[in-house]
Amino acid sequence: MTETTILHRPPTRLSRVDEGAVCRLLQDVVGACFAVPPEQMRAGSRGRAPAAFARQVAMYLTHVVFGLNYSAAGRMFRRDRTTVAHACRVVEDRRDNPRTDALLQALEDVLGAFTRTQVRR
């Protein structure tokens, strides 16, 4: 198998047991990148713009990197599937900014590598 094949392998579906761990991991990693405490990302309300965008990024990564559908991602973050769909659109629109795109690509690469190492175990 070539390196290209490995990098473009479709995401593996997580078991229900893993979803809670993934949610905490994403909140910690994304929260650190955006200087937002994980508690703010877990809040029931939208919160301030930085916390809301960090939560949107975490939901986007849940869908893109870990392959969860909108409903499953919504359950992880205690949000509706339409909220996750909106988050994905917002994040995709923000990728027009080169700095945001580079940060998101780095997060996707790191979390994708983590996923591949966990799947092999």
Predicted segments with their positions:
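General nucleic-acid-binding
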Residues: M1-D28, R121
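Helix-turn-helix DNA-binding elements, focusing on the entry/boundary residues of the two helices
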Residues: Q27, N69-Y70
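DNA major-groove recognition helix of helix-turn-helix
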Residues: H63, A87-C88, R95
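Helix-turn-helix DNA-binding helix
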Residues: T83-A85
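Short, Lys/Arg-enriched anionic-surface-contact patches
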Residues: A32-R55
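Short, amphipathic alpha-helical "recognition" segments used to contact nucleic acids or chromatin
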Residues: A52-G67
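Short Lys/Arg-enriched helix C-cap and helix-to-coil transition segments
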Residues: R95-A113
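Short alpha-helical "recognition helix" segments of helix-turn-helix
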Residues: S71-F77
